[in-house]
Amino acid sequence: MNKQNLIDVEGSVTESLPNGMFRVRLDNGCQVPTHISGKIRRNHVRILPGDRVKVELSPYDLTKGRIIYRLRNKSSNDWITS
């Protein structure tokens, strides 16, 4: 399947499930179980409940997704200036 055919939506992580799975509430209100993409797993990106993420869905199966990006929280202290 081409990358062009995939649907990108944003949502927030509501629950952490076993084996790198997460339950994500999408912006349209649906909840879908998702897994982490390979690049996120390889780079050890930490995803916690409450994080905003970008999810990729297949047009053939909208019941499962893949987390492809963790969005920065505006209130996080990732960038501390002195």
Swiss-Prot record:
User: What is the predominant subcellular site recorded for this chain?
Assistant: plastid
| Signal peptide location | none
Any idea which UniProt keywords this protein has?
Chloroplast, Initiation factor, Plastid, Protein biosynthesis, RNA-binding, rRNA-binding
- Record-level GO cellular component terms: chloroplast; cytosol
Q: Which InterPro entries match?
A: NA-bd_OB-fold (IPR012340), RNA-binding_domain_S1_IF1 (IPR006196), TIF_IF1 (IPR004368)
In terms of Pfam families, this protein maps to: eIF-1a (PF01176)
Q: Does the keyword Transcription regulation apply?
A: no
Q: How does it assemble?
A: Component of the 30S ribosomal translation pre-initiation complex which assembles on the 30S ribosome in the order IF-2 and IF-3, IF-1 and N-formylmethionyl-tRNA(fMet); mRNA recruitment can occur at any time during PIC assembly.
PANTHER family of this UniProt entry?
TRANSLATION INITIATION FACTOR IF-1, CHLOROPLASTIC (PTHR33370:SF1)
The record describes the protein's role as: One of the essential components for the initiation of protein synthesis. Stabilizes the binding of IF-2 and IF-3 on the 30S subunit to which N-formylmethionyl-tRNA(fMet) subsequently binds. Helps modulate mRNA selection, yielding the 30S pre-initiation complex (PIC). Upon addition of the 50S ribosomal subunit IF-1, IF-2 and IF-3 are released leaving the mature 70S translation initiation complex.
Protein name as it appears in the record: Translation initiation factor IF-1, chloroplastic
Tell me what gene encodes this.
Answer: infA
